[in-house]
Amino acid sequence: ELTRLVQAVLSVCRAPLVLDADGINAAAPHIDVLRGCACPVVLTPHDGEFLRLGGDPKAADRTQEAMRLADRTHAVLLLKGSRTVITDGLNVYVNHTGNPGLAAGGSGDVLAGMLVSLLGQHIMPREAAAAAAWLHGSAADLAAQELGEYGMVPEDLLLRIPRLLL
């Protein structure tokens, strides 16, 4: 079962770990396990996953709610939305790039892939999450300028990332 697998990985992992989608859903019932994890963890929930983790996506202050959950879990939280919030519980970045085209299925997988790539280059988790969010949103903004934001697919993001890195 996925929940047991995620718990097992959390108990032995030493490298930075990104939990997204089903990984978040599997960890949610045992969220306090993250506090004792030996590796840095980055959670990348959308509002529904944030709710399952114990956050309130409709809170009056979304940033404070994200900080509260990051502090509780000892994880870096990248709360996806129209203004993505990245926090480790103490420091906060708010990403202002991106557009509704990012709601397309698979775009979160592109974000997770960029984040894992940055972590693999030994960039600190909070900074890697902030950089990945900016790159992701900026790639979507380029795609929207060139193609429109409706009908955007993950490949549209992937094709624009190299221009942002030059």
Question: At which residue positions do the language-model features occur?
Answer:
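Glycine-rich phosphate/dinucleotide-binding loop and adjoining beta-alpha-beta core of small-molecule
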Residues: 1-97
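Alpha-helical structural signal
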Residues: 6, 111-115, 154
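N-terminal loops that bind phosphate or other acidic moieties
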Residues: 8, 33, 85, 122-123, ...
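Short beta-alpha connecting loops at secondary-structure transitions
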Residues: 48-54, 96-102, 112, 141-149
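Short, small-residue alpha-helix embedded
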Residues: 52, 104-135
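Short, charged, surface-exposed loops that flank catalytic or proteolytic processing sites
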Residues: 56-64, 122-130, 148-152
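Charged C-terminal helix
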Residues: 138-166
